[in-house]
């Protein structure tokens, strides 16, 4: 199928599930900042007037979890009159955290394939499959639909925080549909933005008048600024633009829907454009390959595309709990590769060390929270873990690796 419409969505930091992801990763940042060897699997639940922290943590760090939770909720924007019914200062915060199972800890600390190589000593924290993807549709080598959906969500949050549109509240979602012809993006078919707002705007309470006001404001202050540097731009006469299609969006955030860590895994990755292994990222320390190996798979895929060895690349990795080396490595280039997929796999095995300890070392994952002032993983917990133009993410820095791949591939050309 060469002609089609593909759609991806994003959500703002005030979405209930994203509140949870940010809290879980804020806990991770705090623990790793004090104790880089912390083992963390932190899950968060939010509902009307309630936040629950649960999971398994083994760490020497001392963290005031209740204070941390309230600060994250406050920074997102749920405080006082702008809280939309969920307030950082008054919500109940419950903490129910246990230690990591000694059976799991044993497998991670002493890998089944242990030998004299220190990086073989750390086994994978669980079994699982992870996918990484890259394509040449955008400068950051991400699919255009998810890239544009994130741009809109980021800009929507920005105009709220800066009070450019002072009637906006924290919860919101974006969705973008792109027209493809012969497999290439050619135009923006539809943009959908759902955003929480006050029940009254400048004295206006009529539902349709409010919706029209929001629509006009969002086109001017969100859509245009978010897309002004793109080659493919929305056209006000051709691009379908939908805003709050149900009519109004006053009740939102945890007051409107319960939230849970790990429920936006497609938003976190490639917007459905590539396959997903099923594992979430937030609240998990780097020994959890759901997170670290997914970052490594993106690193590999992006390096391949950056080296111009393929226009599209999807990499699958699989692991067994307590075993350091990947069980399997698979690369798919969708008939866009300049060398065979078997040759690409050889290059991957030669140039990328995909054992958990090696990934952690390559990306400095244990020490980045402290290096970044206690806030690293939390910043990835909204607006995507890949292709971020606003963050310095080590798995996105592929220039050096891509150059080596390009040089090494010459023997196959």
From Swiss-Prot:
Keywords: ATP-binding, Cytoplasm, Magnesium, Metal-binding, Nucleotide-binding, One-carbon metabolism, Potassium, Transferase. One of its GO terms (biological process) is S-adenosylmethionine biosynthetic process. Mg(2+) binds at residue 17. This is S-adenosylmethionine synthase. It is an enzyme of class 2 (transferase). HAMAP family: S_AdoMet_synth1. Residues 100-110 are annotated as: Flexible loop. It comes from the Bacteria. It catalyses: L-methionine + ATP + H2O = S-adenosyl-L-methionine + phosphate + diphosphate. It comes from Prochlorococcus marinus (strain MIT 9301).
């Amino acid at each position: 199928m060469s002609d089609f419409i593909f759609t991806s969505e994003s959500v703002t930091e005030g979405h209930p599930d994203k509140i949870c992801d940010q809290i879980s990763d804020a806990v991770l940042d705090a623990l790793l900042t004090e104790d880089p060897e912390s083992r963390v699997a932190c899950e968060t639940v939010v509902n009307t007037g309630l936040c629950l922290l649960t999971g398994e943590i083994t760490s020497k760090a001392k963290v005031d979890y209740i204070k941390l939770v309230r600060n994250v909720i406050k920074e997102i924007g749920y405080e006082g009159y702008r809280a939309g019914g969920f307030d950082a200062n008054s919500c109940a915060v419950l903490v129910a955290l246990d230690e990591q199972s000694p059976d799991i800890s044993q497998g991670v600390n002493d890998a089944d394939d242990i030998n004299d190589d220190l990086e073989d000593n750390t086994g994978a924290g669980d079994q699982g499959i992870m996918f990484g993807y890259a394509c040449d549709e955008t400068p950051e080598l991400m699919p255009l639909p998810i890239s544009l959906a994130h741009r809109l969500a980021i800009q929507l949050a920005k105009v709220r925080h800066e009070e450019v549109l002072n009637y906006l509240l924290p919860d919101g979602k974006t969705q973008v549909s792109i027209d493809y012809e012969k497999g290439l993006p050619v135009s923006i078919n539809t943009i959908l933005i759902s955003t929480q707002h006050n029940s009254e705007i400048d004295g206006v309470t009529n539902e349709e008048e409010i919706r029209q006001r929001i629509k006009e404001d969002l086109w001017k202050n969100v859509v245009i600024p978010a897309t002004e540097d793109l080659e493919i731009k929305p056209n006000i006469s051709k691009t379908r633009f939908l805003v709050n299609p149900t009519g109004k969006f006053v009740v939102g955030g945890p007051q409107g829907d319960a939230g849970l860590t790990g429920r936006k895994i497609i938003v976190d990755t490639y917007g459905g454009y590539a396959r997903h292994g099923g594992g979430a990222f937030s609240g998990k320390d780097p020994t959890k390959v759901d997170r670290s190996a997914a970052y490594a798979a993106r690193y590999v895929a992006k390096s391949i595309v950056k080296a111009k060895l393929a226009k599209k690349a999807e990499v699958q990795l699989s692991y067994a709990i307590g075993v350091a080396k990947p069980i399997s490595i698979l690369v798919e280039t969708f008939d866009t590769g300049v060398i065979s997929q078997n040759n690409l796999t050889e290059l991957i095995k030669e140039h990328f060390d995909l054992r958990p300890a090696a990934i952690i070392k390559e990306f400095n994952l244990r020490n980045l929270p402290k290096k970044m002032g206690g806030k690293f993983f939390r910043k990835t917990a909204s607006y995507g873990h890949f292709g971020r133009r606003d963050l310095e993410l080590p798995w996105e820095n592929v220039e050096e690796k891509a150059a080596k791949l390009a040089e090494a591939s010459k023997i196959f050309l």
